[in-house]
Amino acid sequence: MGYSLGYIGEHWEEYRAVLYIVLLLPVLIHFLIRRKTQLSNSDKSSEKKDEVKKQREVKRFKRVGKRGKIGSPSSSIRKQNDTIDWKNSPLCVFYSTLGGTAERYAKQVHEELSSLLQRDDIQLLNLDYVDLSEYFVSCPENAIYLVVLPSYEIESSIDYYLSSLQESFSDFRVPKDPLHGLSGYAVFGLGDMENYPGDKFCYQAIQADKWIKKLGARRLAPLGVVNTQLAPTAQIDALLQWTRSVAECLKNGTLLKIGNTDSLSSDVMDVEDMGSMMAKAKAEAALPVGTKEMVSTESPTYKALTKQGYSVVGSHSGVKICRWTKSAMRGRGFCYKYSFYGIRSHLCMEATPSLACANKCTFCWRHGTNPVGTSWRWKVDPPEMILQGILKAHYAKLKLMKGVPGVLPDRYEEASRVRHCALSLVGEPIFYPYINEFVSMLHEREISSFLVTNAQHPEALRNMGMVTQLYVSVDASTKQSLKSVDRPLFKDFWERMLTCLEILREKRQRTVYRMTLVKGFNMEQIKEYTELIRLGVPCFIEVKGVTYSGNSDQSPLTMKNVPYYEEVIDFVKKLIEYIDIHLQDLGVRYEIAAEHAHSCSILVAQTAFKKDGHWHTHIDYPKFFELIRTKKDFGPFDYMASTPDFAMFGNGGFSPEDTRFHRKKKTQTSKPISATISETATISEAAA
């Protein structure tokens, strides 16, 4: 239907309102729809923000590893309540000591807490002899740690403990906050404020407190420190007051708030009150790397080693006269090295250019008095100084035997010229940065070198030059048993040992596996030893029963762990049987070549050292030095010598030119040698 303009004009006023409504209606509808959409999007955005916020709250409580792994949040959420189940939480008192003071303090803390908390299950643990990874990388859930630490300006095992904490914090393989599962911790430090003031006072206890907290643990009580120059009674009173404050905190079931230290004696300072002292405390050590002495003359380590008969040379070397040297000078017999290799004991010097070691072996006869470490961080003495020092100290010790009843004049005269050097005294000789230069100086003086390594430094072994005889200690055949026997410091100790054995196979020189048998620890898995022999294919295998070196709080060994000689023989025979069965593809055969019954020692050798049906395990020393001077390549068969009949298996291994000495006992007469082997073993035999 059409409308004219005239008609629209006549009726415009009548229909104008309706027309406006029709035209504006789509706009209104569009506006309403858009408004509704905006409100809907706003609600969704708000919900999304709430969800993100919730996720962030959850993540805040989760352990996130440095590789991005997320752990359980339960422990951290629980920790928000600051509650402690002190009746059921494992409680450990740790300590480290050189002179014994910190040990006495730790025992005092242990006894006081046991009494106050009415608990008989509190553990007292020496940091030097526990697996640090079991306590400070993975820890017992809800455990409570108390740490009693002295501080030394000299090198000590505390340096290794602190470096382990720092490495755990920096190691991407270690989950973040590994100690978050602890209910709490507290540290007590001992320091000499008069002699070591300022930033040296209790600096290692301060570092321990700092690193344990960085690893996720929550401080149970402020760090306590005491001045050891106070009167003994004042020191003990201060220690007990700190211990009681910890016990009170545990009984209250809550973490002690910072600043709540009114109960502490004025003789005990907490970390918050130390102010600038805490700020000054060095992050690593009191002295830069390379300036600390491994064994200072003022250190408890020095005093302990000298008390045991060692002469400490320079800052990290040592020498000692072994019992077999004294025995040989009296004509009472030589050690097993004479039976096996032709070394006359009075011509041999036992020494080491490194008193530090990377293991804390259960059968070590130093009872923890030598330093430990995984990397060289000390002052380095030059090899010339070390060689001159150990020779001087060795000869000085020998002079003390002049005129001693029973000493043979000809043996005493011969002993004034060292012919052999056994680098097996203590520690890890190959650890010394200039070991090759040191050995070369020995050879220049025509002193043979017998170097023993614990198979924990593969790079040093790979770079090791020619020695007269190169040993690797193989103290166990499985990873777990090696960990139990050697208590190594390296986390990858097993891989390091396997690598060292492979490197040994590449060496074109006389190589030896030294196996120390510890009953109840490493005598069961005989078959597994054959696989280790496959890796290194040594020229010789020395098998020796462990020497009992006396009781020690740090060693679990007793006389029950010392095998009888018959048991050592049985082990060797079974080992050879397994080698014949499982290593036929190598084309190498092993047999028993020699023995030294008095030392519970047997030598197994490759049959290649049997010439015309007779063993040649001894060494032609003049020939060896002649070959060294040519500077040409040579091998182990180029300087071998005939083994004497007395050393053959079945003949005992005692030199016929000497007289066997039997120590008389008040309660019994001498027994046959086969029955008394384990009982006559001495510290020096283990060192020989």
From Swiss-Prot:
Location of the Radical SAM core domain: 341-580
Positions contributing to [4Fe-4S] cluster binding: C357, C361, C364
A single GO cellular-component term on record: endoplasmic reticulum
GO biological process: wybutosine biosynthetic process
An example Gene Ontology molecular-function term: metal ion binding
Chemical reaction(s) catalysed: N(1)-methylguanosine(37) in tRNA(Phe) + pyruvate + S-adenosyl-L-methionine = 4-demethylwyosine(37) in tRNA(Phe) + 5'-deoxyadenosine + L-methionine + CO2 + H2O
Cofactor(s) needed: [4Fe-4S] cluster
Function: Probable component of the wybutosine biosynthesis pathway. Wybutosine is a hyper modified guanosine with a tricyclic base found at the 3'-position adjacent to the anticodon of eukaryotic phenylalanine tRNA. Catalyzes the condensation of N-methylguanine with 2 carbon atoms from pyruvate to form the tricyclic 4-demethylwyosine, an intermediate in wybutosine biosynthesis.
Family: Belongs to the TYW1 family.
PANTHER family listed in its UniProt record: S-ADENOSYL-L-METHIONINE-DEPENDENT TRNA 4-DEMETHYLWYOSINE SYNTHASE, S-ADENOSYL-L-METHIONINE-DEPENDENT TRNA 4-DEMETHYLWYOSINE SYNTHASE TYW1-RELATED
Protein name: S-adenosyl-L-methionine-dependent tRNA 4-demethylwyosine synthase
Originating species: Schizosaccharomyces pombe (strain 972 / ATCC 24843) (Fission yeast)
